[in-house]
Amino acid sequence: LGGSTVIPEVSDAMLQANNAYIPLLELQEKAGGMIADLVNVPAAYVTSGAGSALTLATAAVMAGKDDKKIEQLPDTTGMKNEILIQKRQRYWYDRCLELAGAKLVEFGSVQKTLPEDLFNSIGPNTAAVHYFVSASEEDRRNLSLEQTIEIAHARDIPVLVDAAGQVYPLDNIGAYVRMGADFQCVATKYINAPQSTGLALGTSEMIRNISYQSFVGYEGRRVRGIGRPHKVDRQEIVGATVALRHW
């Protein structure tokens, strides 16, 4: 909670950004393209922390590109609003999913999660399946991410991955999207970026829908999504991008 320490290259880049003006829609697009290329994923977006990325991604899977639904959130009446999560994977930060208006639905037991637990839990209101990746050794009593993706995608359900702290080895950044997940968040405070920044990595459709929910989308498109408080300034966008490049 004391904050991260940015490296000199990041602070220098942020200072340069402080003295220049650019439309944030354009800056997010350029930064996202650079980040996506660096980690070999289809698309990326700089957010106000990994928790923000989780909230925006949850809103994105519920509302998509429908402006009426975007403005309706966090009221999810008439929408698919259920996010499935393994009972064994409930954790401190899954609250970020509920902030968008979603309802968390547990599957499996505290002892073990089986493939059929997920299969049988998918219903008409399922918006996505959430998966938490921890730094510890893989727990074989959990349903694996590979199995989760296979089962969910067979029913056209997107998979969201919280891998906020998985920044080492370096290949972890973007690994879960490359594996087939639709979204992965990264907390860039762990890579010498400003503590208040994070990354949303994912498919082009997912990141586009996240952008519609964002602060930039709210002001630039004049569509009132839930992301207005999730502001990222140009200095932070540049700082996070440069930090990733050096990491």
PLM segments and residue spans:
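Glycine-rich phosphate-binding segment of PLP-dependent enzymes
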Residues: 1-23
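Conserved PLP-enzyme active-site core in the AAT-like
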Residues: 1-6, 31-47, 51-245
